[in-house]
């Protein structure tokens, strides 16, 4: 079709702009660290703590002690303080593969096997005479693992004639069908050639070793261990963090069955069902195909160890299950009808039997460290990990096209530890490049000092990072134990509470918005002099006040230069403004560089900034996008320039109250 007009006329053209593009994962906060189970190096969005527990687990045993990772404590506190969405990335050490399901076996069943064939050529030690009849039953055809058979020719290595081999790779064959092979197709080794007729007769396939295979999407601390079901239904090595599978309700009339995912430590008579997928089949053409219903996709971290890792997704069907995927279907049933469209009467070869089993054959260790937890975290071991285990996750979350969040933390990494400082510097650099989040980090191990905290802070310079001190004692929500945690474990919850009750540009500090109600005590009760030293040194003190409890009492960033951006609330204000205005600007790319386009921008940005001003985020603002900064030269370079001037609202951090005592009868000043 012509795309231009030569003579006068009308040319109607199509421009499809209805494509649906994938959106980045949106979360309020991002937490990176070890968990009991879950996908490793796969950022996962959760919206409640219950959902977090289902995906990542809670407590675990190490020796005779019970522990909870800081990641879990931080997630609990975040949701308790009003957080609504959390992006969790599990990190691990060691190498491993996911666990697969134990054998999912099926029944014997009626299939279309090779029946009798007649020909005047027959292989028998090179002698070919007369007419011979032979039969090959379905049970001996090929590997005996499917109901579909093809007939192929293979050249004999020691004879001049060909032979017929039956394989299980064909399709469309049904009982009673005939296949005619023209005369001469077998070669010339004596005897007159006549047509070879093969009739497909009924045959029984042997029981399949594995109808289909499930694979876990996540690995437990010791991973999903296989084990037999005992008399009470207990799974050996089973735990609440492992899972098992069960096949129920096999229907030989419909060719369907149901898949149940159960908790690993449940009992046959007291099942703890996590998920159920009903009436699935092995028919890849059907909407209830088991892989389509449960999902068969898996994500693999590519480019590990580089500055630009990414996730590669393989598989055809998105995962509806949170715990497993269909790794492979070994016995597919294309349809349940013969070539005449008549329904068959037996489906037992198409479905597994009622049974249950476990997951096993996982290889490797999730945790290879000695396991220093809570206040024992050190340079060489942080919860079974070392600093380098975090790098891939940090670099993966640097991609703002895929992941959005406004605060990020990795509780357990302490900047004073040399092996922790390197990945934390990577994280700071990544967030500065993103420009849309703030990092909450820890400076000192447990039992640090005020001077040590300020000395460590002096080596950092970024308005996208903030540090808090000292450590805090909290009650582990899952084990009930009192444990010591670094401040970054709790601060995302403070930010969540601040945003729930106020706005992002309000200071997440002070009695009203900085209270740490779930904290039992701070590692150290800071004096006024301690707080002064810390705040002068860019460290936000966590103070203890009688009757008020433990309170975040500072909101500085780690920026060295004294400016508005050395405060957390101003940095977060800029993040909010840039995020909204950038989205407005995205819609202008490739639009005409005219006054109309500029007015479109102004008509959206000015009202937004007015609303921020009304909500106490700005004292004043001005937006310029006109001919003064979009000259002819700028336009000729295909540029559109806007200038946004803002006066951020400052917080009242230093309040001076002068009490003046006057003599009796004195006049008060105007």
Features from the language model and the residues they span:
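Extended Gly/Ser/Thr-rich low-complexity repeat segments
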Residues: 71, 75, 130-134, 173-184, ...
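A short, polar beta-strand/turn micro-motif
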Residues: 106, 114-116, 241-243
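Intrinsically disordered, low-complexity regulatory segments in eukaryotic proteins
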Residues: 229-252, 394-399
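Structured, hydrophobic secondary-structure cores that serve as assembly/anchoring elements
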Residues: 1-105, 116, 209, 250-258, ...
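Extended, Lys/Arg-enriched charged tracts that mediate electrostatic binding to polyanionic substrates
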Residues: 213-237
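Short beta-strand micro-motifs enriched in acidic
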Residues: 152-156, 248-250, 626
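Conserved, function-critical positions that sit in or immediately flank catalytic
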Residues: 113-204, 236
């Amino acid at each position: 079709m012509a795309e231009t007009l030569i003579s006068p006329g009308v040319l109607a053209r199509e421009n499809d702009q209805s494509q649906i593009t994938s959106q980045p994962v949106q979360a309020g906060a991002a937490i990176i660290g070890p968990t009991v189970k879950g996908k490793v190096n796969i950022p996962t969005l959760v919206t409640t703590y219950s959902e977090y527990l289902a995906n990542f687990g809670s407590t675990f045993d190490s020796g005779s002690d019970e522990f909870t990772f800081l990641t879990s404590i931080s997630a609990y506190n975040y949701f308790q303080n009003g957080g609504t969405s959390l992006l969790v990335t599990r990190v691990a050490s060691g190498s491993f593969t996911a666990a697969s399901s134990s054998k999912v076996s099926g029944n014997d069943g009626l299939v279309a096997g090779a029946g009798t064939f007649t020909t005047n050529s027959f292989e028998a030690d090179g002698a070919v005479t007369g007419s011979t009849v032979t039969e090959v039953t379905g049970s001996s055809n090929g590997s005996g693992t499917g109901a579909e058979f093809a007939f192929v020719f293979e050249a004999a290595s020691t004879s001049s004639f060909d032979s017929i081999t039956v394989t299980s790779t064909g399709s469309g064959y049904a009982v009673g069908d005939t296949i005619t092979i023209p005369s001469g197709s077998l070669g010339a080794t004596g005897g007159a050639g006549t047509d070879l007729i093969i009739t497909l007769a009924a045959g029984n396939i042997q029981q399949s070793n594995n109808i289909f295979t499930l694979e876990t999407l996540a690995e437990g601390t010791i991973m999903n261990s296989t084990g037999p079901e005992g008399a009470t239904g207990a799974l050996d090595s089973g735990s609440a963090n492992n899972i098992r599978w069960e096949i129920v309700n096999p229907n030989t009339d419909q060719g369907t069955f149901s898949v149940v995912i159960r908790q690993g430590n449940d009992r046959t008579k007291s099942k703890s069902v996590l998920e159920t997928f009903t009436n699935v089949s092995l028919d890849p053409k059907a909407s209830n195909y088991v892989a389509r219903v449960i999902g068969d996709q898996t994500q693999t971290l590519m480019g590990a160890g580089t500055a630009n890792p990414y996730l590669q997704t393989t598989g055809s069907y998105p995962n509806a299950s949170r715990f497993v995927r269909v790794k492979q279907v070994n016995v597919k049933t294309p349809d349940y009808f013969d070539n005449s469209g008549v329904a068959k009467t037996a489906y037992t070869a198409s479905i597994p039997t009622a049974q249950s089993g476990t997951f096993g054959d996982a290889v490797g260790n999730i945790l290879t460290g000695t396991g220093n937890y809570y206040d024992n975290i050190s340079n060489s071991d942080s919860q079974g990990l070392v600093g380098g285990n975090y790098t891939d996750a940090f670099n993966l979350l640097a991609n703002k096209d895929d992941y959005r969040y406004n605060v990020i933390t990795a509780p357990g990494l302490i900047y004073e530890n040399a092996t922790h400082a390197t990945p934390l510097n990577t994280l700071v650099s990544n967030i500065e490049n993103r420009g849309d989040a703030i990092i909450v980090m820890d400076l000192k191990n447990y039992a640090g000092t005020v001077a040590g905290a300020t000395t460590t802070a002096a080596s950092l310079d970024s308005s996208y990072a903030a540090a808090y001190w000292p450590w805090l004692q909290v009650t582990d929500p899952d084990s009930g134990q009192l444990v010591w945690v670094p401040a970054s474990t709790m601060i995302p919850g403070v930010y969540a509470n601040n945003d729930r009750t106020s706005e992002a540009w309000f200071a997440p500090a002070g009695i009203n918005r900085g209270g740490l109600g779930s904290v039992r005590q701070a590692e150290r009760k800071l004096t006024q002099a301690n707080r002064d030293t810390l705040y002068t040194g860019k460290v936000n003190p966590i103070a203890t006040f009688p009757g008020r409890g433990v309170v975040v009492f500072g909101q500085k960033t780690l920026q060295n230069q004294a400016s508005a951006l050395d405060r957390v609330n101003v940095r977060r204000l800029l993040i909010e403004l840039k995020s909204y205005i950038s989205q407005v600007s995205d819609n202008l790319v490739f639009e005409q560089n005219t006054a109309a386009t500029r007015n479109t921008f102004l008509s959206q940005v000015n009202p937004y900034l007015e609303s921020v001003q009304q909500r106490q985020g700005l004292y004043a603002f001005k937006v310029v996008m006109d001919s003064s900064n979009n000259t002819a030269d700028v336009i000729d370079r295909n540029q559109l320039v806007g200038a946004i001037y803002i006066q951020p609202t400052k917080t009242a951090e230093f309040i001076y109250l002068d009490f003046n005592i006057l003599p009796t009868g004195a006049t008060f000043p105007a």
